């Protein structure tokens, strides 16, 4: 839910990047001896996720607990997106996402080529939502308005992999990004590809949706 809204609104998702937030200098990125992948020269425990993948750093525009700055609608903030996906929190308000016996509440854009098994196994970098903000998203998110929104209840949103940048050793012995064209640039890298994950700098966490039920958002009511 990071595309430009079709109507003016104060609603800005927590995961949306803001003007003034800056990516960390790549001069802090280096290579482990023996061609064993990437690391930060001043690496800390939060720089890697639980699967050991290194994450892109980015400053945060905060005033107390409030995220400030004009939204960059088409971009997400790496650590805020990761936070919501890891903890399955609402991507707008960071509170508990909606969950019932049918599972967590996710939104997806309607597709013209939905596979035979429906949305089972769908990969998403969009964190779940609470019911209030799911309803706001289908009205305000330009991409969902144009394509049409599908409401999904998901029993098992499995950790799948990451979106980001693959690196290799450059001619000067320093990390060099591998360039990809088209959809390949945003294709998730599965965690199971352990030969590549040490060379990956992640910017979005991806889950695989299992136990999926398509529901009508208008029929959903707040949990008791």
Label the model's feature ranges.
Residues 90-94, 130:
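Short cysteine-rich clusters marking metal-coordination/redox-active sites
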